[in-house]
A protein has these predicted regions:
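Alpha-helical transmembrane segments forming the membrane-embedded cores
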Residues: 169-259
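A surface-exposed beta-alpha-beta supersecondary segment
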Residues: 29-32, 43-137
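Hydrophobic secretory-pathway targeting helix
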Residues: 2-40
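Cytoplasmic juxtamembrane interface segments
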Residues: 7-21, 67, 79, 152-177
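Membrane-embedded alpha-helices of multi-pass membrane proteins, especially ion channels
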Residues: 22-36, 155-163, 188-195, 233-243
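Juxtamembrane interfacial secondary-structure elements that flank transmembrane helices
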Residues: 30-53, 196-205, 245
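Juxtamembrane membrane-interface segments at transmembrane-helix boundaries in membrane proteins
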Residues: 5-10, 126-144, 209-224
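Physicochemical signature of membrane-embedded alpha-helices that form the seven-helix bundle of GPCRs
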Residues: 14-24, 137-154, 173-183, 187, ...
Length: 259
């Protein structure tokens, strides 16, 4: 009895291992999606790109002076963290987060005058929050991430269905997984590459376009939470394909032994 149970469990260990990987992926991708949605450290520290004023820039003293003239002391040290759905603004050791589509709470507060033309008294303003929102709205899109989370849950449930003994239709579910697992790996591979390119572009273009006034830092935590699930998806896809052919060979050998 014990040996039979041990062999039963051992045969299902690869699928159980894949279930664990998919379970981890659901949480990693969900945390990645919810990054910067609240001011708690767990979520606000999960960001794609963080923007702040470059203290070594020659314009930094003007920025500090401009904020001081508006009685916004400490705003020269402002930093804006961008996520898939929201932004978090850090000012004077306080964090406030808002949806990237509704930044009315920050309107006309973070804009700073950096240059004034004496001939017509016009000024050039720089709003670091609006810039971060533009990056988040126009370049970063959560749709692939959301689709990947949904498909991961479906794949997890279908693999769990196969592991449970006594259920019918496992042959069809196995073929379904044979298609879904590689598709999911390719889909999130595309999403991971898009996030990587978007983060690199958001850093490089903003720093150069602002002539070094703004500094951008890529979120290492978000990068790790992007590429780790992709690695797990590849492992699961290889495992699903390998188990399919293993089970197929066992069926062929069983049929040949009866002939």
């Amino acid at each position: 009895m014990f040996i039979t149970a041990a062999l039963f469990s051992l045969k299902r260990m690869p699928r159980i291992f894949m279930l664990i990987l998919l379970f981890i992926n659901v949480f990693l991708l969900a945390f990645l999606l919810l990054g910067c949605t609240t001011d708690t450290e767990t979520y606000s520290s999960t960001y794609l790109v963080k923007y702040s004023f470059n203290k070594s820039s020659a314009i930094y003293p003007l920025i500090k002076s401009s904020y001081s003239s508006k009685n916004f002391t400490g705003y020269e040290d402002i930093s804006v963290r961008t996520g898939y759905l929201s932004l978090c603004v850090d000012v004077d050791n306080e964090t406030a987060c808002a949806s990237r589509s509704d930044l009315t709470s920050f309107k006309n507060i973070t804009a700073v005058d950096i240059y004034t033309v004496n001939s017509n008294s016009s000024s050039t303003t720089l709003d670091i929050v609006s810039l971060a929102a533009e990056y988040s709205n126009e370049i970063v899109h959560p749709y692939i991430l959301i689709a990947s989370i949904i498909l991961t849950i479906i794949l997890f449930l279908s693999l769990l269905y196969i592991v449970i003994p006594g259920l019918l239709g496992k042959h069809f579910v196995t073929k379904f997984n044979l298609v879904l697992a590689p598709v999911l790996a390719l889909l999130w591979g595309l999403g991971a590459m898009w996030e990587h390119v978007a983060s690199k572009a958001g850093k490089s273009l903003v720093e150069k376009a602002s002539m070094g006034i703004i500094k951008a830092d890529i979120g290492l935590k978000a990068s790790a939470m992007t590429w780790t699930p992709f690695t797990f998806f590849v492992i699961v896809a290889i495992g699903v394909i390998g188990l399919y052919f293993r089970d197929l060979n066992e069926i062929i050998e069983a049929v040949d032994s009866k002939v």
